[in-house]
Amino acid sequence: MPNPLPREIVPGIFWLGKCLEVSYQGNPLHAYNSVYLVAGEECSMLVEGGHPQDLAAIEAQLDALLARGVPELRYLFTTHTEVPHSAGLGRMLERYPGTTAYGVLLDLHLVFPQHSDRLRPFDFGDSIDLGGTRFVAVESVIRDMPYTRWGYDTQRRVLFPGDGFAYSHYHADGHCGAFAEEAFSLDLPDMTALFAELALYWTRFVDIDPYVRRLDALLDELEVQLIAPTHGLPIGDLEATLPAIRHGLRLGSLRKAGQGF
């Protein structure tokens, strides 16, 4: 099956990347380490640095979009410096010399010393003007690193939650490149619980309900219209899909070690 990405999920925001095959109970599953190109009227930002195995595909997709007339790529943003989210930053900085990287970048000046002058901090409430919209660093409610920052596009009201809203999908059922609402056969609670156990292990040792309540409050405060996660399918109908996500987070927090997997 050809790669269905890139896909324009709302006007001016493009979903880039390709699937990663994983195994679950002996069956093949697919997951994403997604990257998003956020275009304003004057310039664009790349959200997430990309996983190493995806970089060739991401670069080809990005070059094609820029050649089509998407405003110049000027900014890079990573939610946190874990490999699937930031490993490609050095390569992107090299390939696009007019860009600057933003985030809580910790020791990346040691990883990419040749680009240390192009690494910038990006704390909660900081924003970047892309022309006609701003990209804002917001609270990261569900995360695997304490310094994670989520991103938010103010004009299109799109939330970029990194490891939040993470779940796998079924390749054989045609879910690749789909919105969550288009993946009719997907067991979203189970796939959310699976990802929580593997990537958000701490959720099994806490009462998850305060986090769920804070997540709901943040979505209301920002008036989020679409969610673009790094490791899940985009969510276009929050009212229809979020109950399954909440159920999956609660299910994952109740599971004992190894149960169900």
Locate predicted features:
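Short, glycine/acidic-enriched loop or turn micro-motifs at the edges of active sites
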Residues: 51-52, 83, 166, 234
